[in-house]
Structure formats: C-alpha cells, structure tokens
Amino acid sequence: MGSIRTRLLWLCLLMLLALLHKSGSQDLTCMVHPSRVDWTQTFNGTCLNFSGLGLSLPRSPLQASHAQVLDLSKNGLQVLPGAFFDKLEKLQTLIVTHNQLDSVDRSLALRCDLELKADCSCGLASWYALRQNCSGQQQLLCLHPATEAPRNLSTFLQVSCPPSWGPGTIGALVAGTISLAVAVSGSVLAWRLLRRRRRASEHSLSKAQMSPHDIPKPVTDFLPRYSSRRPGPKAPDSPPSRFTMDYENVFIGQPAEDCSWSAARNSPSGDSDCYMNYRSVDQDSQPVYCNLESLGR
C-alpha cells in the first residue's frame, strides 16, 4: 500500500509541474477587453489583451505602468507609434501578429529587453537593424503568417526583402542620370559642330578646285553695239546704263556701192571695205575690218 501511495504522490506532483509549466508558457494569458476602449483611462493589470478589436493606436501614452504583456494582434495595424509605449516601463512581451506592419518605431527597437512577436514582413527590417546593437542579443525570430511557425528573421529579410533605396543610393542614381544626360547632349553638340565644319571645308575645297572658265565673270553695265557704219565723230561720253543690253548686229542704211557682198575674197581690204565699229569699255571707237562674206563662211 505504501508503494502505491508514493507512486500516486509522484504522479500528482508531475501533473502539478506540468500545469505550472503550461501556465508559464502562456505568457500571462488574459481576458480580452471590450470593443470600446477608452485610451484615457488607467489600466492596472499586468496583461492587457486588445486582440481583434480593430483599434487604431493613439499618439498619446497608454496609462498602464504595471503591464508586462500587451496583445495588439489582429487589429490591422500598420504603424506602432513610439509615444504609445512611452510609459510601459515594465513591458516585456509585445504581441503584434496578424498586422500588416510597415515600420516599427526605433524607440521599441532600442529596448533590448522587449520581446516582439510579429509576423515575418519587410516592415521589420529597420527594427532588426537597430536590434543588432544590443549586446548579448539572441537569435531574432518572426512568425509565419499562416502557420505561426517561428522563422529566422535575418534569413527571411535576406531572401524576401531586397535592400531598400536609401538617400545615398537615390542621390547616386540621380547624379548618374544627370551625368549621362550631359554626356549625351555634349556628344550630340560636338557631332553637329563637326558636321558644320566638314560642310564648310568641303565648300571651300570645291571653290578652290573650280577652273577660271567656271568662275562667272562680272557683267559690266555698258555693253556696246556692233554696227556696219563707217567711223564717225566720237560720241560724247555718257554714264553707263544700269540695264544690260543684248548683243545684236545692226545695219543702218544701204550698204555702199563699193561694198559688195560678192567681192573677190582674195582682194586686199581697203579703207572703203565694210567694217564694224567696235566701242571698247573705255569708250574708244575702234574700227574692226572684216570681209563679211568670208566671215559668213
């Protein structure tokens, strides 16, 4: 009988220890507060559960100086304002699972004794970077949103969250873009200038290669007429006309009797032969003798 009683006592002791361990592992599980929460009131409990109430956190401190566990899960929170946690000096565990957190205030990250239970998300990157400064920091974990299984936060951030573009990266990108634009515009400007110079040099070279016959001669204002009259008295000089006169053969009056078109071709030309009166640029009248019949050949 004594041995049976001893076994029963040991069994009861083991069950009691198991219950104590289970209660300790639940992190002071407490009752959920009603949906309407007055943030101005004072909360004296050590465990505050505001889970699933669809709350938004105010920018003023929560009056709960004795709280050790704070459950804010399933509220659709995106930001944890640092001012809300200013007076929670005894807070040890903060539960924010099932919230789409974009960022966590740096004041919470600097509290090295605070345990944060949150879903794995890229919003924890800044919090993780600051927590690396805590001495004796254990491995930081996050919970899978679906299975709530713990995962290594460092591994999750490296695999799932690419490094964000900080001010230095953005500045370098802007500077590189500006440099590229300046280089492209400079190249286009240099190409246009080189093209203009090449055209100018080609034009000068083509001018230099032109023969004297290709160069157009200037047209004088005065162009004399040809006539078949004998030289007469010199006409008075008159200013040159601005209009260009056409060349033409002008025959005035009847040809002289001794100026026969059928004269012998080999006879020497005399003073009475037909001639043309040519007036040069200097207005000098000069006779030009010719045999018109031979000229017609």
From Swiss-Prot:
Q: Where is the segment annotated Disordered?
A: 202-244
Q: Name one GO cellular component term.
A: cytoplasm
Entry's transmembrane regions: 170-190
Q: Write the signal peptide boundaries.
A: 1-25
Q: Which SUPFAM superfamilies does the UniProt entry name for this protein?
A: L domain-like (SSF52058)
Q: Does the keyword Plastid apply?
A: no
Glycans attached where?
Answer: 44, 49, 133, 152
Q: Does the keyword Nucleus apply?
A: no
**Spans of the LRR repeats?**
66-89, 90-113
Question: Mind listing the GO biological process terms from this record?
Answer: canonical NF-kappaB signal transduction; connective tissue replacement involved in inflammatory response wound healing; gene expression; heart development; inflammatory response; response to angiotensin; response to hydrostatic pressure; response to transforming growth factor beta
Segments on the Cytoplasmic face: 191-297
Keyword list (alphabetical) reads: Cytoplasm, Glycoprotein, Leucine-rich repeat, Membrane, Phosphoprotein, Repeat, Signal, Transmembrane, Transmembrane helix
Major subcellular location class: membrane
Spell out which residues lie on the membrane's Extracellular side.
26-169
A Pfam family of this chain: LRR_8
InterPro entries tied to this protein = Leu-rich_rpt, LRR_dom_sf, LRRC25
Topology within the bilayer: Single-pass type I membrane protein
Residues with the modification Phosphotyrosine, per the entry, are 289
**Coiled coil feature spans:** none
**Location in or out of the cell:** Membrane; Cytoplasm
State the function annotated in the UniProt record.
Plays a role in the inhibition of RLR-mediated type I interferon signaling pathway by targeting RIGI for autophagic degradation. Interacts specifically with ISG15-associated RIGI to promote interaction between RIGI and the autophagic cargo receptor p62/SQSTM1 to mediate RIGI degradation via selective autophagy. Plays also a role in the inhibition of NF-kappa-B signaling pathway and inflammatory response by promoting the degradation of p65/RELA.
Assembly and oligomerization: Interacts with RIGI. Interacts with SQSTM1. Interacts with p65/RELA; this interaction promotes the degradation of RELA through autophagy.
The name on file for this protein is Leucine-rich repeat-containing protein 25
Gene that encodes it:
Lrrc25
